[in-house]
Amino acid sequence: HQRDRYAKMGFRLPVDRSFVLPGRGTIVTGTAATGRVAIGDSLHVHPGDRRFRVRGLERHGEAADSFEAPGRVALDLAAASTDDVPVGAVLAAEGTLLETVRVDAWLRALPHLVRPLKARQRVTVHIGTTHVEAAMTQLSGEVLPRGEAAFVQLHLDRPLAIAGGERFIVRSSAADPRFGQTIAGGQVLHPAPARHKLGDPAVAQALGQLFEGEDDDRVVAMVALARGRGVDDAELAQHLDLPVDVITRALKTGLARGRIRRFGRPPRYLAPAVVDELEAPAWIELEKGQLGKPAIAAVALGSEGAAARATPL
């Protein structure tokens, strides 16, 4: 069942080898965590805007027409060079992966540390087959004792293609006397979050649901973290490590139970608490006769018809 879930998600392959095979061309290898790929498919190389067609593939040294994750795979890419697809790049199905400079994550400090992790500090994050310098902030605003876990926000020095659910390790940065020492390990919860206020209980609750909640709870939590801008179907699929059909079912359940609100066309989803915050000023504007803002009108009126015509929030 779990393998089926992985296979139904977008294909993603962090490249750990890239080389030229005489008579074949450029070959890349890696461990694909999710998705399916077949000969003839076009894959997006992240970071960047290059795309290459899969000319051939092998699994366990055997040629095949298609591959289903998880597992090791080698891909023969048409018209690509090793410079086009270097080690550290990520190959992904079109539109399924984000390049980001900020992520929310669950983090556990290793038990052997002499000192706790600071509330804010520079670190090196190793994720996929690459690494990046980052500023790490404890969202509690407090230090993290050795062996303890917390939610953090990582501000990356350069954009990386990162998926929800990815695991990573953290090492001390060049600015730290313990340079290169492994200090923590973690899991990405949100690959493209907003900045958060430190010590915000609503953020902590949503991240807790993303980390260990059921599928329905995780979708509700991701909608809540979108705040007033809301989130659409494509963004939910990019942010969550869940198959699209699971997200669709969770949205229907959340809407039916009043845990999620929907506005606009194409639809965007908001948390009920966010809608409540918007309703008060919207009603004031309506009472003043300010009906020129359809999104505000839709929120205030709570009308399916008005909501369908509303500009997305």
Describe each PLM feature range.
Residues 62-66, 79-313:
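C-terminal effector modules of nucleic-acid-centric enzymes and ribosome-associated factors
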Residues 1-111:
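Conserved catalytic-core segments of large NTP-driven translation/proteostasis enzymes
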